[in-house]
Amino acid sequence: MKRILLLVVGAAILMAACNGKKDVEFKQQNEMSEECLICGALLKYLDHDTVMECSLCHKREPSKTCCENGHYVCSECHTAGLDSIVVMCLAERSTDPIEVLEKMMSKPFCHMHGPEHHVLVGAALLTAYNNALPDSLRLNLAEDLPEVISRGRQVPGGACGYMGACGAAISTGIFMSVVTRNTPLSTDSWRLCNLMTAKALEQVAENGGPRCCKRDSYLSVLTAVDFVKEYLGVEMQKAKVRCSRSEMNNQGIGKKCPVSGSGM
């Protein structure tokens, strides 16, 4: 419990550091912005790293992403408040990871696109998986959720385009690694964790780009539900998905999107 309190306090401190008085307004106006969190302008993705200054905390670091007006928001500020999901997930009783994911994506810290999805997918799966287990086999979520958050935060924004590996799909592998206690020296679990990520990446890739963090998160979660049932023998609830945010994505693929319209 101490660790949970520290995470919540830390999230509050980080949010305060990243948000001055004038920044509160943009947060309220752009809680689900599909583009720049500062001005709403379209994002630009560069070919090479350029040193940029975060418009919120003013930290300078290399990045390939900014908006057309030059605004850059670092991953730390972009995901401020993310640690609050620990309390949410500990109180959650659903065995449906899509339901858990939707609750987290509805919070102000989650934007249309962004590296927060690299954490949320794994956290939703871990929570629903644990709820689907018999009481005698339950995990220690108070320890495992912060681990998922820590690992997910290491996957940078734009990994789908710049590394050829969608962070939402990688998050399924993070989830699998945590529940199987996998390490680089493991044998059977090493295979399972990499296979999980590969299956999710395949599903994401088959639907093509441009990226949509919402679509790719849904696809990754649904793939993981089937994978866990087959390989771990644990059955989570699998809900039908119909995205309610398609119109907020300027680069959406329209009728080609498997989770828009009639859903999947």
Please name every model-derived segment.
Residues K2-V8:
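Sec-dependent signal peptide recognition
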Residues M15-A17:
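C-terminal motif of bacterial Sec signal peptides marking the signal peptidase cleavage site
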Residues S33, V51, K64, H71, ...:
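Residues immediately within or flanking Cys/His clusters that coordinate Zn2+
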Residues L37-I38, L56-K59, C66-N69, E76-T79, ...:
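Short, cysteine/histidine-rich loop/knuckle motifs that typically chelate Zn2+
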Residues L43, E61, V73, G81:
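Cys/His-rich microdomains that often coordinate metals
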Residues E92-L125, P210, K214:
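Polybasic, low-complexity association/targeting segments
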Residues H117, G158-V178:
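Conserved phosphate/anionic-ligand binding catalytic regions in large, soluble enzymes, centered on
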Residues V179-T180, L185-K229:
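A structural-propensity feature for long, helix-poor, extended segments
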